[in-house]
């Protein structure tokens, strides 16, 4: 009887936690890019390029993994790299994270402030929060102990992004610039880029959402970055397209 009572209390505590709605905390995300698969997809039937990829396989790891944090409170989020993995080798410009980059989203004001390193330049963005057209499906999966629902959108007109969100976390944000679902995005997959981003743990804390800006930053819009990327990569072929897609996440 005593054992049954203890089991009942454990079940009750788990049920209470499952019903808890969270407004502040810090998530850790694991970001993986299967870079060999990405390059093979880009240069499928590419002749000499396939020979180059075969040689690169001998030098570069098949998958590169980095870790990011997403702090959230007061209906705002701050996404940044947790620490740079200096052992990683990246086959494609744009895959390597920068500890100077971050994305701050203020959903009360509908504004994004962002620092992004591209082509040896550092961009400071102040613009409206990006809008995404989501289609929610019936599929569910568990991520970091939360039941998450699946949703699908596209970037750059044709690049499919799959997201998994939980409505137990009240802030309607997510990693990178993604947002707009009925809760926090805990998982992302971009098959065309062989990229996944999944939350691995949640710390129940109220993190300060602090980020650095120069004394007189020159802010640009998201569209300016897209134009500069297009101009800088116009002769890069399929590889340039992939870098452009990555920069638009």
Model-derived regions: residue spans:
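Sec-dependent N-terminal signal peptides
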Residues: 4-13
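Sec/Tat signal peptide C-region and signal peptidase I cleavage site
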Residues: 14-18
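Extended soluble regions of mature proteins
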Residues: 20-249
């Amino acid at each position: 009887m005593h054992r049954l009572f203890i089991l009942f209390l454990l079940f009750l505590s788990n049920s209470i936690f499952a019903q808890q709605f969270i407004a502040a905390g810090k998530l850790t995300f694991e970001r993986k890019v299967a870079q060999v698969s990405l390059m093979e997809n880009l240069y499928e039937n590419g002749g000499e390029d396939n020979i180059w990829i075969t040689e690169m396989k001998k030098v570069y790891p098949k998958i590169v993994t980095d870790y990011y944090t997403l702090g959230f409170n007061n209906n705002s989020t701050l996404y940044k790299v947790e620490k740079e993995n200096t052992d990683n080798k990246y086959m494609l410009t744009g895959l390597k994270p920068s500890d100077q980059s971050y994305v701050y989203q203020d959903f009360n004001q509908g504004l994004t402030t962002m620092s992004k390193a591209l082509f040896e330049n550092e961009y400071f963005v102040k613009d409206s929060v990006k809008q995404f057209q989501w289609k929610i499906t019936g599929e569910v999966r568990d991520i970091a102990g939360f039941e998450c629902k699946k949703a699908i959108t596209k970037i750059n007109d044709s690049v499919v992004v799959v997201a998994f969100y939980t409505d137990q976390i009240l802030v309607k944000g997510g990693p990178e610039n993604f947002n707009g679902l009925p809760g926090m995005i805990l998982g992302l997959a971009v098959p065309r880029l062989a990229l996944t981003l999944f939350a691995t743990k949640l710390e129940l804390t109220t993190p300060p959402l602090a980020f650095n800006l120069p004394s007189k930053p020159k802010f640009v819009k998201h569209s300016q970055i897209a134009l500069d990327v297009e101009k800088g990569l116009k002769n890069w072929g399929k590889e340039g397209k992939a870098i452009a897609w990555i920069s638009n996440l």
